[in-house]
């Protein structure tokens, strides 16, 4: 009996996502189940470039980057569920609905990103996503991603 891998390290993540520093927002996948859910982490470091301007006197991780981390997690789940990208394919972040930011995320926090696959139609996949810090929801949203050739 073989056990299918349910985690991903940074090397495996970079094989699926085109993003690189400073825009790669997923450090590790701690679990996933194809066509169902994926849980990932993003370690928030004061050394990230966005903190030089957002905000120097009180560094806060931008909410739009939390959404980007969720979108990258949905791309990973989609590729693991429906096949790895060909050399000229990407998952584009297509839309976000019902985004709520509940608490600031600051350097030193570890974002735990949980995404749930809902459905796929004509190459557009729908997901629910939440991001947590210390078990507390800091952001939630509905996301859609489109698999397209470039």
From Swiss-Prot:
<feature type="active site">
    <location>
        <position position="54"/>
    </location>
</feature>
<dbReference type="GO" id="GO:0005737">
    <property type="term" value="C:cytoplasm"/>
</dbReference>
<comment type="similarity">
    <text>Belongs to the thioester dehydratase family. FabZ subfamily.</text>
</comment>
<dbReference type="GO" id="GO:0006633">
    <property type="term" value="P:fatty acid biosynthetic process"/>
</dbReference>
<keyword id="KW-0456">Lyase</keyword>
<keyword id="KW-0441">Lipid A biosynthesis</keyword>
<keyword id="KW-0963">Cytoplasm</keyword>
<dbReference type="Pfam" id="PF07977">
    <property type="entry name" value="FabA"/>
</dbReference>
<dbReference type="GO" id="GO:0009245">
    <property type="term" value="P:lipid A biosynthetic process"/>
</dbReference>
<dbReference type="GO" id="GO:0016020">
    <property type="term" value="C:membrane"/>
</dbReference>
<keyword id="KW-0443">Lipid metabolism</keyword>
<keyword id="KW-0444">Lipid biosynthesis</keyword>
<comment type="function">
    <text>Involved in unsaturated fatty acids biosynthesis. Catalyzes the dehydration of short chain beta-hydroxyacyl-ACPs and long chain saturated and unsaturated beta-hydroxyacyl-ACPs.</text>
</comment>
<dbReference type="InterPro" id="IPR010084">
    <property type="entry name" value="FabZ"/>
</dbReference>
<dbReference type="InterPro" id="IPR029069">
    <property type="entry name" value="HotDog_dom_sf"/>
</dbReference>
<protein>
    <recommendedName>
        <fullName>3-hydroxyacyl-[acyl-carrier-protein] dehydratase FabZ</fullName>
        <ecNumber>4.2.1.59</ecNumber>
    </recommendedName>
</protein>
<dbReference type="InterPro" id="IPR013114">
    <property type="entry name" value="FabA_FabZ"/>
</dbReference>
<dbReference type="GO" id="GO:0019171">
    <property type="term" value="F:(3R)-hydroxyacyl-[acyl-carrier-protein] dehydratase activity"/>
</dbReference>
